[in-house]
From Swiss-Prot:
Pathway membership: Amino-acid biosynthesis; L-histidine biosynthesis; L-histidine from 5-phospho-alpha-D-ribose 1-diphosphate: step 7/9
Residues carrying N6-(pyridoxal phosphate)lysine: K214
Enzyme Commission code(s) on record: 2.6.1.9
UniProt key word Signal: no
Cofactor(s) essential for the protein: pyridoxal 5'-phosphate
CDD domains referenced in this protein's UniProt entry, alphabetically: AAT_like
Name of the protein in its database record: Histidinol-phosphate aminotransferase
UniProt organism field: Shigella boydii serotype 18 (strain CDC 3083-94 / BS512)
Taxonomic classification: Bacteria, Pseudomonadati, Pseudomonadota, Gammaproteobacteria, Enterobacterales
Enzyme class: transferase
Keywords: Amino-acid biosynthesis, Aminotransferase, Histidine biosynthesis, Pyridoxal phosphate, Transferase
Length: 356
């Protein structure tokens, strides 16, 4: 009689799953962490809620109302979750039948769309972006049959550019009555004029993902949002955990979304954008850098002459970047988070010392 192992008992798709390689999971012993698009310094908050003996609200009122006011939507159009990553998964769980429906996304892009779908047993379809990293609308149209959720990251991680708004409109018309279109706006604070939040009334099948991890400098808090019409939010409420936000998380999130919290966030954004432009200008003058791509975010994508050697050399010096070589159309590319001026200078000096 053959022995059944614990792994044998697991679902086949989980046995075969490659987990998302987060920046922390990839490790490294650096002192300059520029691989996770975090804000470089900690923001201090004081906990005001001491009722830790009680379960929290499922959707904390202060957080929802503050975020709705900030985003320019109604409170009924906001769902708060454990990071935007939970929002990605909730949309698949609410709208996709495992073994029947599919999601669609456009690489090179964020890796959690596929991991969430594969974990649940939902097929992934990909339509690579065009050479300018814009949507291949014809390719998407050809693959839409059976697709229930389409994920589009804008500005796109890791390329840093915005998706053409007219292409978004075309996609929303293509999918009307067929699929949910999810605009992942994790980095929208760095280009707020490009948000699609004002489109929700026009498109009942539009959902928007947001986070406090980037411009709000709260990656350790794990707090994200889904903006959508009330019908979508009500469906997501059926599949979300009963207490997604702990009391301390809700407490800090509400403070971060207060009027003074929003002002502080915008000051951070202005500082990061200024630092980004400084770093882009410096990178363009460095011999081992082949190309620096424009960015609307808090990170820069650049192509290097010997990216693997450069990545390892900086890693050995304690400067941790994100290797994008395995992504479609990104051979030779590394992604650099915009940090402090001191961190930028460390990167610049290390790259200038590279042999070409």
């Amino acid at each position: 009689m053959s022995t059944v192992t614990i792994t044998d008992l697991a679902r086949e798709n989980v046995r075969n799953l490659t987990p998302y390689q987060s920046a922390r999971r990839l490790g490294g012993n650096g002192d300059v962490w520029l691989n996770a698009n975090e804000y470089p310094t900690a923001v201090e908050f004081q906990l005001t809620q001491q009722t830790l003996n009680r379960y929290p609200e499922c959707q904390p009122k202060a957080v929802i109302e503050n975020y709705a006011q900030y985003a320019g939507v109604k409170p009924e159009q906001v769902l708060v979750s454990r990071g935007a990553d939970e929002g990605i998964e909730l949309l698949i769980r609410a709208f996709c039948e495992p073994g029947k429906d599919s999601i669609l996304y456009c690489p090179p892009t964020y890796g959690m769309y596929s991991v969430s779908a594969e974990t649940i047993g939902v097929e992934c379809r990909t339509v690579p972006t065009l050479d300018n990293w814009q949507l291949d609308l014809q390719g998407i149209s050809d693959k839409l049959d059976g697709v229930k959720v389409v994920y589009v990251c804008s500005p796109n991680n890791p390329t840093g550019q915005l998706i053409n708004p007219q292409d978004f409109r075309t996609l929303l018309e293509l999918t009307r009555g067929k699929a949910i279109v999810v605009a992942d706006e994790a980095y929208i604070e760095f280009c707020p004029q490009a948000s699609l939040a004002g489109w929700l009334t026009e498109y009942p099948h539009l959902a928007i993902l947001r986070t406090l991890s980037k411009a709000f400098a709260l990656a350790g808090l794990r707090c994200g949002f889904t903006l959508a019409n009330e019908e979508v939010i009500n469906l997501l409420m059926k599949v979300i955990a009963p207490y997604p936000l702990s009391t301390p998380v809700a407490d800090i999130a509400a403070q971060a979304l207060s009027p003074q919290g929003i002002v502080a966030m915008r000051e951070r954004v202005a500082q990061i954008i200024a630092e980004r432009e400084y770093l882009i200008a410096a990178l363009k003058e460095i011999p081992c850098v082949e190309q620096v791509f424009d960015s609307e975010t808090n990170y820069i994508l650049a192509r290097f002459k010997a990216s693997s050697a450069v990545f390892k050399s900086l890693w050995d010096q304690g400067i941790i970047l994100r290797d994008q070589n395995k992504q479609p159309s990104l051979s030779g590319c590394l992604r650099i988070t915009v940090g402090t001026r001191e961190e930028s200078q460390r990167v610049i000096d290390a790259l200038r010392a590279e042999q070409v």
